[in-house]
């Protein structure tokens, strides 16, 4: 099954529930569904607040599924493609979504009902408010321990929210 981001609306509040059994990863399908959810929410002037949460018990979004990203990187290397200011990469869905969430006039709330690492944590950081359900959950940007730069703005948002010293602890 590929990732989903299902939108429900109750009055002025929209709820976006994430589901990607069985690992709880964000993938390209969930990324596309998230952008579509942001489009739908931004098009409805009656919506004043948005709650992002996981639809699986104990899981918000564990992290971005790196298998397709690794395959894409290998394909680009095989074709001799490298980053260039003359040929920038197009904005990925997660970047579009987090940028639009930050710029939105609505209140975005990350209701963290479980683990949120990597891309899931970065999505939560883009929200105005983060609420955490009690439990043994993990949060952070573990990719930095593998010398991989977080790719969805976490390195900028986290220090702004908690300060540089605390950000380094995560």
Q: What label would you give each PLM region?
A:
Residues 99-170:
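Crotonase-fold acyl-CoA enzyme core
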Residues 22, 56, 135-137:
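A generic "binding-loop/recognition-motif" signal
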Residues 54-96, 147:
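Glycine- (often His-adjacent) and acidic-residue-rich active-site loop
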Residues 1-53, 75:
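Conserved CoA-thioester-binding segment of acyl-CoA-metabolizing enzymes
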Residues 16, 52, 65, 123-124:
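Hydrophobic/aromatic residues within transmembrane alpha-helices
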Residues 33-36, 96, 169:
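Alpha-helical elements of Rossmann-like donor-binding domains used by nucleotide-donor carbohydrate transfer enzymes
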Residues 29-33, 93, 100:
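Charged catalytic carboxylate motif
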